[in-house]
Amino acid sequence: MAAWDLLFRRVHLATFAGDEPYGALRDGALAVRTGRIEWLGAERDLPREARAAQEIDGAGGWLLPGLIDCHTHLVHAGNRAREFELRMQGANYEEIARAGGGIRVTVIATRAADEAALVVASRPRLARLIAEGVTTVEIKSGYGLELSAERRMLRAARALGDTAPVRVTTTFLGAHALPPEYDGRADDYIAEVCDVMLPALYREGLVDAVDAFCERIAFSPAQTEAVFRAARALGLPVRLHAEQLSDSGGAALAARYGALCADHLEHLSEAGAAALAAAGSVAVLLPGAFYFLRETHLPPAARLRALGVPVAIATDCNPGTSPLSSLLLALNMACVLFRLSPAAALAGVTRNAARALGRGDDLGTLEAGKLADLGLWNVDTPAELCYHLGYNPLALRVFGGQISGAGDVAQG
């Protein structure tokens, strides 16, 4: 037989394929050729003639799919530390937003930054995720709120993916907030999003999916639906920030349009959960924002799972409500705050996160034919990835069949 490029021996495999927790296969081996998994199974079943250009002794560690952060606002300029101080003095998210703070503060800073500055500002956040075994990251626009600034954000996201060992998927979030120049004219702004911004950015190849923020401080269900119609006319998948602060019916709307996912969902109704289940949409839970905003209304994680809704977990990395660039910490938060099991939480940053990005066919599980994005972890059980605080047990990271890490992120 021809030599494999890479062969892992003496590893336990957490495949996340099938119905068993972790999809565990102990005392396993896994082989890679031309960037994809070619063989995996019990090490005793390796072909006798098996050989590889490079062999890795896993020393009894656990091999998992590369982690996926499926909801981030990673590209932005500035920070909102002052807003954090106000919140600690008693102001809430809605009060800050209605007083002209919140997202608009980041819009001002991001509009003032050129593409190169956005790349430089965002690269350390991406490097921290990569260092924790993340191999795929979703990055949204939404802090430009006009064509040229939204373009710069999406181009910066593409540039990050081109210069780092990570897959970046881009999401156009023009309907994130109402820019100040459109005060009192939300319908006019949505028309600009749908008729000008989205078509232009789509033609430039900058958009993989379209998102919106359906909430009383953002956009109505009718305005959100206009964005969805425009996306669907271009053949683009949709996703939605829904039911974070109130039950607006956004999840049911997302389900009606076959959305990849609906995200946040703290105030999700039974009808909304059932709609997501019927549509096959993923529920993306964001414990960082829940924690940072000191929310008390839990998303119905157990009910979602009982209904068969795939549950994903993400950092929601953003400057205002979740300045978090640690997916490992998000895993712990999901278990402690949302009462997910470690197996369910880890499925949420592998198999279900891939589904939330429409990449379930080639990412998120260890199966023959899938892309060889892998993490070798120096742990006795996969649950340790959710258990530890401030500790990263990653031993080795593989991206597209090549061993790589945060040190490979270009600094120029």
Curated annotation (Swiss-Prot):
Its cofactor is Zn(2+); Fe(3+). InterPro entries: Amidohydro-rel, HutI, Metal-dep_hydrolase_composite, Metal_Hydrolase. Its EC number is 3.5.2.7. Pfam families: Amidohydro_1. It comes from the Bacteria. Keywords: Cytoplasm, Histidine metabolism, Hydrolase, Iron, Metal-binding, Zinc. It catalyses: 4-imidazolone-5-propanoate + H2O = N-formimidoyl-L-glutamate. SUPFAM superfamilies: Composite domain of metallo-dependent hydrolases, Metallo-dependent hydrolases. Binds 1 zinc or iron ion per subunit. Its main location: cytoplasm. The keyword Metal-binding applies. It is found in: Cytoplasm. Zn(2+) binds at H71, H73, H241, D316. Fe(3+) binds at H71, H73, H241, D316. One of its GO terms (cellular component) is cytoplasm. N-formimidoyl-L-glutamate binds at Y143, N318, G320. Pathway: Amino-acid degradation; L-histidine degradation into L-glutamate; N-formimidoyl-L-glutamate from L-histidine: step 3/3. One of its GO terms (molecular function) is iron ion binding. Catalyzes the hydrolytic cleavage of the carbon-nitrogen bond in imidazolone-5-propanoate to yield N-formimidoyl-L-glutamate. It is the third step in the universal histidine degradation pathway. Belongs to the metallo-dependent hydrolases superfamily. HutI family. This is Imidazolonepropionase. It comes from Aromatoleum aromaticum (strain DSM 19018 / LMG 30748 / EbN1) (Azoarcus sp. (strain EbN1)). The gene is hutI.
